[in-house]
Amino acid sequence: MSNIPSIREKCTGALLASAIGDALGWPYEFRSRNTNENLQMGQGHFVDWHRKSGGRYWNHNEMILAGEYSDDTQMILAVSRSLISGYDWKDYFSHKELPYWLKYERGGGNALKTAAKTYKENNTPWKSKNAGDYFCAGGNGATMRILPHVIANAYFSNTEQLMDDVFSNSIITHGHPRAILGATCYAYALNVILHKETILQFGELINIIIDGVNVWGRFREHVLPTDWDNYKNLNFEYNYLNEWSNCTNSIIDKLLYIDKSLKKGLLVNDSTVLTELKCFDKENGAGDVAVLAALYLVSKYANNPILGIKTAAYTVGIDTDTIACITGGLFGMLCGTGWIPAEWRMVQDYNCLCNIAEILLSNDMKATSKRISDSNINNQELRSSPIGKIFIDKVFEIPSGKSSKIIITKICTLLGQTLYLKQYERVTEDVQSTESNKNVLCSNNKIMSSKQIRFNLAKLSSVSSDPSFSRITFKKIVQIINLLCDGASNCDQIAKKLKVDECMVKAIQDAMN
């Protein structure tokens, strides 16, 4: 690059490229549950795809539109709103953003979801029954979300305060040193690039980060919550401060390896380096692994950010969405926005990301946020939510098996973020009641031309609330009623004929009496 982008260009580029990397890499991430077997990799543009969602009991295929991002960018925007809110950002993020995120999360990791559920119950992860899991949570869920702190600190240049904030943010959901150090190392790298006023030389970034280990690698006990003392008396797996030191040393060793590899120039092999960085191992989702991979790719492809992001997004076997997101954040901070192709500017919530950059850089974030929010109000019916005013764009349904459905409400925030809220419902017969003992008149095309049946609603309600009743379809219920109304009284024969439990037939017969 011949020109150094402005601070605003850098910060806007970092937010946009983070979302772009996330959206490019998400379909190919090993945990994405992509059901499109023939999806071609490496084309360099956004794609529509389907993901298997809902787990065992609410299984459904969810359509992901081209350019839509995952939890990585969702968390970046959640942290941004927390900083903009005007309240204590740690409290806002913990008790507003995280619990609400459970309604719209896309691809969130276990540590994040567990922490969010814990805060929803008005508890903290380090004091909960899952405290052991919390202190073993070393994933990249903390690293991926800390970019807004760097942007909000852009004009203050207070590196120590930045590190304090990133440390404080990380421990809200992750307790293992790998997660926290991954976040502080990433923030330090972003901050170095943000304030670099000369062209970054090949490999220079790696050496600057190595030299800064006493800043990003320091355990910041002074910012710990007063009740965050479990780390001193952990009775499982590791001694905390020893593990902190070991993880710091491991990151430095890997950075030295990257530096040595980069000196090979054109002979350096991406696969070899990423393998050494553990990107293909079971620990490939760790916070330190993600940031090390991103630092390598940004250092190697500094003059070709498009290729660098593609490499992160399309390398089979690595954590493609998060590594591409972090790589994108570094490239955006380095190169600004001018390099971003037109097709990549179709990323979900492009305008929102630009707005967030403007707000985080402003002297009065709350006032700037209000000005932008007010300009986006166009006669919508606004509704309140824990994260501010929203409006509904549309509502649609997705089937989940034979007896369930997912109601998806697409909403928008006033800053322009799109969220898909999910509501899970069992599909039941459309029978309404107002009194517990009221009889309901039911008709069926075959039998009701000459007959009428009366159901005792109290009995029918009792039957339908039985968990086993959910296994029988409405069609089978009608067939049972047909046979009973035609004079068949042998419940055993009806059950065998229709392959249902005899107790269900008897229950329906009893409700008809």
PLM features per residue range, with description:
Residues 488-489:
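Residue-level signal for the short linker/turn that defines the boundary of a DNA-recognition helix
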Residues 1-479, 502, 507-513:
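Structured, active/binding-site neighborhoods that engage oxygen-rich ligands
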Residues 493-495:
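Short alpha-helical "recognition helix" segments of helix-turn-helix
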Residues 482-484:
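Short alpha-helical segment immediately N-terminal to, or the first helix within
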